[in-house]
Design a protein with these regions (language model features):
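Polysaccharide-binding surfaces and accessory modules of carbohydrate-active proteins
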Residues: 5, 10-13, 17, 21, ...
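Conserved, mostly hydrophobic/aromatic
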Residues: 18, 164, 288, 334, ...
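Glycine-rich, aromatic-flanked loop segments that form ligand/cofactor-binding clefts
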Residues: 72-73, 77-115, 242-257, 300-324, ...
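Short Pro-Gly-centered flexible turn/kink motifs
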Residues: 101-106, 283-302, 737-745
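Carbohydrate-binding surface patches
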Residues: 242, 644-687
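Aromatic-lined carbohydrate-binding/catalytic grooves of carbohydrate-active enzymes
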Residues: 325-461, 475
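Glycan-recognition surfaces
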Residues: 419-458, 502-609
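C-terminal beta-sandwich/jelly-roll accessory domains of carbohydrate-active enzymes
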Residues: 671-748
Length: 748
């Protein structure tokens, strides 16, 4: 059993392979958080929190005559509001009189096999009985509000998931102005916060800063998890590295506006509260109604950032991603967007596909512009019927020609949006989110459809399902190209307008559920102007997400590096694009572009017909190499060997099979130097006592100052310990952005 309860001491212990999570019901019935970290044995953990009378930290009423028991000082599992804890709260609730307050006490608990599920929200699932569930029931007597704290314990994964379920068992309505998913109080000490900020075309840039005495907030108010901050953070010891130091991860399974707050208290405790963004949130909870919060995924690693990342990678691959595509190699695709933009017809697309097929590409994806009057981004969104001027005869003649080449066919959609210049908007202007009496802000010339309305979800499900039923479409790229503003729904009364942004997200999830369950063999790829909705919530429906609209290989190094802290490479959409690059104007060798894109789903986004003969040969070889290495890249352990933001010379990363049978080292020189220092690297994830052969050395885009006779060469053999601790030195690399791939195979 991974969940134990000591009824005498009233202590819960959740255990995974390498961690312990301890909670205690105190004398007043409050659920206290005692410990989360490396596995420990028995012992009185309340001694960590001795009774102390601190000025201006009020005591519970029961302790008013012998002070020192204050909610402001105790570590708590889920905090109420306005009852004496002045740190971050999980909940703000008002009763029908306008009185704010909640103080939850223990009622009962149950332990169940398997994993809890949430109503209308994506969450982790159990595989082969690899999870247990703890439900702790608590009650606020004054309001009749019941709180169920949900814990999913994945023992072998070293993961604990959490969510909260709130039910109004009182006689009058309540209003939730804040409803966080989880609170985590961490022990005394100095901590660093790692978070992943950015902007469009420059997502998930790692930033590391000390946890101070202020409140540090990572959030989005944009209606999506956003390009600007990712709903994932790490708290680690200040001296933690990739291979040492205690590290805690907190990841939300949510794709809408969210908020993750970190606060260091007056006594040095650090509290993390994660949940739905409280700005513009107000949920009415009538008697008998229940509200589920989004899920949070917690993980702890005692030995650095790399094992923490690997725990998340395995968990997301196994217990977040679903459907037949999660464990399969994805087809190598070509997308026409950067080759044609809106200017295409059947002949152009077939010509691109013919060249791609001759080089080994497996799928042709038709991007934006195939529907309605969509000749630019001012019109057509919402009208999911084929533009027969561009595609005479519709989609079927094009698909038949693509399939005749031995290729699959995929299609771009953006179901959540509408143009004012569209038949859908002219028919249903009330289906767009706009404020009464105001001209709305426009993003990419489009408005957001009101997916809080079931009839809008039904329309979209019907229109997209019709496309998938009537045409042989094997891939869908689901885009979302603006942030939400002017949020107001004409389907709900004034008192429910604070529910709309969350109801919108529930509508998106309902639509994604209907489409992915209705067409399980279709490969869905998420997108939101690139990586604007790259989160665990969307990964429950799509096994891959377009990582960024920035396809520049050198820029992608920092984007994919930051993404890798929480998300596996098999979820990162990555393509080889044209040069000069359309976002930066940079020219990079085509093989270096491929080395970077291979650490993702791998595909192409350019007109292959414009390549030179040598580049076409390179593309053929890239595809063969990717297919050969894909199992290792997709399922192997990922290691960050350098930080591209700190190492101006080169960026290196590595994959190793979990059983240590093979490894792949990748390196890109980002700033070639005269008379450079040696490139010295040690491998990771190998078996010390094994023997490995260097059976693949590929240098791309480089020029050598001279031959190195005594350097590394193909066929050399090394012990695992030599590669792990002595390492290898690579030859000097010159030219513009050269790259290297080294492959090792275990031979004994």
């Amino acid at each position: 059993m991974s969940i134990r309860f000591d009824s005498e001491a009233r202590i819960f212990v959740l255990e995974t392979a390498h961690t312990s999570y301890h909670m205690k019901v105190d004398a007043l019935g409050h659920l206290l958080h005692l410990y989360y970290g490396k596995t420990i044995g028995t012992g009185d953990l309340m001694q960590l929190y001795p009774r102390t009378d601190r000025g201006f930290s009020p005591d519970y009423y029961a302790y008013r005559t012998h002070r020192g028991v204050s909610p402001d000082l105790l570590p708590q599992e889920y905090t109420g509001c306005n009852v004496g804890d002045f740190r971050l709260s999980c909940l703000t609730v008002a009763d029908s009189r306008g009185a704010f307050g909640a103080d939850f006490t223990y009622v009962s608990h149950t332990v169940e096999a398997g994993k809890y599920q949430l109503t209308g929200l994506p969450c982790a699932h159990a595989e082969e009985n690899d999870a247990e569930t703890l439900i702790v029931r608590m009650q606020d007597e004054a309001t009749g509000l019941t709180l169920e704290l949900l814990y999913g314990v994945f023992a072998q994964q070293d993961v604990i998931t959490r969510a909260a379920r709130l039910t109004n068992h009182g006689d009058t309505p309540l209003r939730l102005d804040k409803a966080a998913s989880a609170c985590l109080d961490l022990p005394f000490g100095r901590w660093d916060l790692l978070h992943f900020h950015g902007r469009h075309a420059m997502e998930r840039q790692l930033e590391r800063e000390a946890v101070g005495t202020n409140i540090q907030t990572i959030s989005s108010v944009r209606g999506s998890s956003s390009h600007h901050n990712n709903p994932f953070l790490i708290l680690c010891q200040q001296d933690a590295t990739e291979t040492s130091g205690a590290c805690y991860g907190v990841m939300m399974v949510y794709s809408g506006s969210y908020q993750m707050d970190v606060e260091r208290s007056q006594t040095g405790l650090v509290r993390v509260v994660s949940g739905i963004q409280e700005e513009r949130f107000a949920w009415n909870l009538k008697p008998g109604e229940t509200f589920d919060t989004p899920e949070v995924i917690l993980s702890f690693a005692a030995e650095g950032l790399t094992p923490l990342s690997q725990q998340y990678h395995r968990f997301l691959r196994r217990n977040i991603c679903r459907g037949p595509w999660r464990g399969k190699r994805r087809p190598v695709l070509i997308n026409n967007w950067e080759a044609t933009y809106f200017d295409f017809n059947t002949e152009k697309i077939v010509k691109i596909a013919e060249k791609a097929a001759s080089l080994g590409v497996e799928m042709m994806v038709l991007d934006d512009g195939w529907f309605g009057t969509r000749n630019d981004d001012n019109q057509g969104l919402g009208d999911w019927v084929v533009n027969c001027e561009k595609l005479p005869g519709g989609l079927d003649p094009l698909i038949e020609q693509i399939n005749a080449l031995g290729m699959k066919f995929g299609l771009w959609i953006e179901p959540e949006m509408v143009n004012e210049n569209s038949q859908l908007y002219r028919t249903h202007p009330d289906w767009a989110l706009t404020l009464p009496g105001r001209k709305p802000a426009m993003g990419r010339n489009q408005l957001v459809l009101d997916l809080s309305r079931p009839e809008v979800v039904d329309y979209l499900a019907g229109a997209i399902s019709k496309l998938l039923r009537e045409h042989h479409i094997e891939y869908i790229k689901w885009d979302m190209n603006r942030s939400m503003s002017d949020v107001y729904s004409r389907a709900f009364p004034a008192e429910q307008q604070g529910e709309i942004m969350h109801r919108y997200m529930l509508g998106v999830y309902a639509l994604a559920e209907r489409l992915t369950q209705g067409f399980p063999e279709v490969l869905f790829e998420g997108c939101a102007g690139g990586g604007g909705r790259f989160d665990a919530g969307m990964l429950c429906y799509y096994p891959q997400i377009w990582c960024s609209d920035d396809t520049d290989a050198i820029e992608r190094l920092t984007i994919q590096h930051g993404t890798s802290f929480g998300y596996p490479v098999c979820t990162m959409g990555a393509h080889v694009s044209a040069c000069p690059n359309h976002q930066t104007g940079r020219t990079t060798p085509i093989d270096t572009r491929a080395v970077v894109a291979m650490s993702g789903t791998f595909g192409y986004e350019l007109d292959l017909g414009k390549l030179k003969r040598a580049e076409c040969t390179a593309v053929k070889n890239q595809i063969k190499r990717f297919k050969r290495l894909n199992d290792l890249i997709r399922t192997g352990d990922y290691y960050r060997l350098t930080d591209p933001a700190e190492n101006a010379y080169f960026t290196a990363w590595q994959f190793a099979a979990e059983d240590g049978s093979e490894a792949l080292l990748n390196l890109v020189v980002t700033h070639p130097q005269a008379n450079p220092l040696p490139i010295h690297l040690c491998f990771r994830g190998l078996k010390e006592d094994a023997v490995y052969e260097l059976d693949g050395i590929d240098y791309f885009g480089s020029r050598y100052a001279h031959d190195v006779e005594d350097g590394i060469h193909k066929g050399m053999r090394f012990s695992g310990s030599t590669l792990l601790y002595a390492g290898l030195v690579l030859p000097q690399l010159f030219g513009d952005y050269p790259s290297v791939q080294l492959h090792l195979t275990r031979k004994g």
